[in-house]
Amino acid sequence: MNRWVLLEHKILGSKLIDIHYDFLVEDQLDCFTWKFYEIPLLNKGFFKVGKQPNHRLVWLSRVEYQLSNNRGLVKRIDHGIFSNISHKQDSQELKIILNGKLLNGLFIIDGNFCQLTKNN
């Protein structure tokens, strides 16, 4: 169905809060997943990303969820449907059009970097 989601993941430690973002793209049986330390904004250049293990499809529909074993709180901050414009869709190279409120435009992941630009 080509769904995607951007999740804010807060891990509350004894003295500090670690915040990162998980970006999930639906694949047939699960979701390709990347970790961002900052949200890639439109036309602001390249942002570093880290490939994560694939996540279950259930994360595409969760709005907020408290993880077990003090692993933090996950909250959906953007989501939508994507259009794949690359010849392939895999975890190392991705070129899709996003239609979210925050992430809207041509989104490219190439290795450890991503970029969001205006969709022409």
Region locations from a protein language model:
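A charge-rich, low-complexity, intrinsically flexible signal that marks solvent-exposed coils, linkers
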Residues: 1-120
